[in-house]
Amino acid sequence: GFLPFVKKTCSYQKSKIKGIFADKSYLSYWTNDFDFGNAKPKSPVTSVSWFAAKKYCECQGKRLATMDEWEYVAMADTKKIDARTKKEFNEYILSWYEKSRTYENEIGKTFKNYWGVYDMHGLVWEWTYDFNSIFLSGESRKDKSTDKNLFCGSGSVNASDLMDYAA
């Protein structure tokens, strides 16, 4: 878990993390370096910087998934590798955005997908290794190579094809 990681890795404790690696919201609901306050022990850890998530994975001998890897695994339901054409699958994913405080739910309680992975949808947004590989700025608006169909969160409301959004 994340608590043993911060106990072992002092530089990622709430009171010791450098501003370059996290903003002031880092572990904001924790009452101190080792107490996660009112959060449930089996709920996902939130308010974690990309640097902390990356370091946590490295300490486990793992790495963050790339955006492509995450999306590939996320498009699977319990029986199909690619369930994006299934109406009920898309409705389930999109209904998650209507729910509040999903970060309080217990991990491992959403469906286990085709790959044996739980909680791909229904808890929290997750960091990916290359989350910043698409950078849009005022200067990139005329860039022909940038995918103009990238959007997140409520940006899906007016999407022409919600299937592109759900996974």
What residue spans do the PLM features occupy?
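Short capping motifs at secondary-structure boundaries
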Residues: 1-15, 60-62, 77
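Intrinsic disorder/low-complexity segments enriched in polar/small residues
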Residues: 8, 14, 19, 88-92
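Compositionally biased, intrinsically disordered low-complexity segments
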Residues: 9, 20, 134-138
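Core domains of carbohydrate- and sulfate-ester-processing enzymes
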Residues: 14-31
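Functional-site microenvironments in short loops/helix caps that host divalent-cation chemistry
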Residues: 27-166
